[in-house]
Amino acid sequence: MENLLIIIAVAPKIMVASPGFTYYDNTKVLPLIAKEVPSIKRFVIMDDIERKYKLSGPLSRSVSYEDYLSQHTALDKATLPQTPISPHDMVNVQFTSGSTGLPKPVALSHYNIMNCGRNIWQQTRMTADDVICLPVPLFHSFGMIVGISSSTVAGSALVLPHEIFNAGKTLQCIEKYKCTAIYGVPTMFITEMANKSFSKTDRSTIKFGIIAGAAMPPELLKRITSAFPLPRLYTCWGMTELSSFATMMHETDSFEKRTTTAGRLFPNFVAKVVEPNTGKTVPWGEKGEFVVSGYGQMSEYLHHKKKTDEALRFHEADLQPGGVGALDDGSLRKWMHTGDEGFFDKEGYFIISGRIKDLIIRGGENISPMEIEDRLIEHESIVQAQIIGVPDEKYGEELGAFLEIKEGSTRPSDDDLRAFVREKLARFKAPRYFWWLGSCQDGKIPSEWPKTASGKVSKPDLRNLIKSLL
């Protein structure tokens, strides 16, 4: 379904279909696509369409690859228009994960993507001798942009363990190909460490890792660093609309900085922390929305002007005393409103406190789920925690915690966990509800985290699950 939404959003004119999609049969999928996406004028099918397809209705627009090739290679190249190419031309449409709605098509240029690769290459000191294990999907900016562009710049090898994430296959590839680096989102590292073959896998060749894509509690980063082990673990922050990363740790940063911040801005990026609704810059060290401008910034959400204007905004205050000023040509700078809440410390490190839309308001108090998740994961029995707002008649919202127990551990009581949270946090930040993965015999609570296509834990799915639990 997510793939269909992406196709609808792009409104393509030609679609090339392989002999079969993963898990699906083309004879069933293509008629659905043809019906839902009227913009498609021609299907080019890499298969024997006469044998397998009834070419009636929507599929009458189909042609085999061989026929399409013979029809179009006969054209005289001299008659084709000569189109100049600019570094700022769109080269890739990358889709956001779509966890909160229809995936948005992000238009990125040669300039965006290759500068991202150059940043990663310089920061990690990658060389042509490196072998990168990349279990992150290529439809995600982490895989497509960070993985491919940085390896292209460095000349390093890429190992793609499996067509979808598989912890066992990833560990096999690390040992088989003597990988020197491993990339992933937090849930991937957690799943790899929990895999039964982890302790038996030779991981001695790994020199560094890159972790990004979701909240990263300090306790989790400490576990990953020591378990693999990873001499250099680079934590990063970014988003698809910024050509992936805008901040990254440096290997000379202290362990405390590497486990509690998302690093500093890359060169040629500028950022502010502002009030979400007004765009007014907040005092240094105070929380607000992180807005970014720079050479990784997308040009638009393709064919979505309204969404583009909502995300990329001008700030008149830039021209006021103390503002960042105009661009070299005198025009106002466009800022990408990221939706992430955070602040800069006195040394310029970015500290993420959560997603603005994930904030829970309990009795008038704004509560960041990430703060409580970080505390819960410090408990010796908990591998991973997710905090969700639960509708409540008295307080508006209460706190609910979904938890994953560490293998071989005894499950603590709800009261013990509340006391544990209150040792470091305010009393009202202790969750009222606790749910453990796989704890319901009726199957209402799954044994594994619901995830987006890019491997992140899906909080919208957890919110929907709460409705059936209360």
Which residues does each predicted region cover?
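Conserved beta-loop-beta connector loops within the AMP-binding
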Residues: K272-V291, G322-D328, K346-E347, T410-D414, ...
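ANL superfamily adenylate-forming
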Residues: A17, F21-P87, S468
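Conserved AMP-binding A3 loop
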Residues: P84, V91-N115
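AMP-binding/adenylate-forming catalytic domain of the ANL superfamily
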Residues: M46, A426-K456
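Gly/Ser/Thr-rich phosphate-binding loop
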Residues: S60, E66-L69, C179-G184, M193-R258, ...
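Conserved ATP/PPi-binding loop(s) of AMP-dependent carboxylate-activating enzymes
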Residues: R264-N268, K280-G323, E365-I367
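Conserved AMP-binding/adenylation subdomain of ANL enzymes
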Residues: M114-V131, F139-A181, T191, N195-K196
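AMP-binding/adenylate-forming catalytic core of the ANL superfamily
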Residues: N3-I8, K13-P19, I182, G294, ...
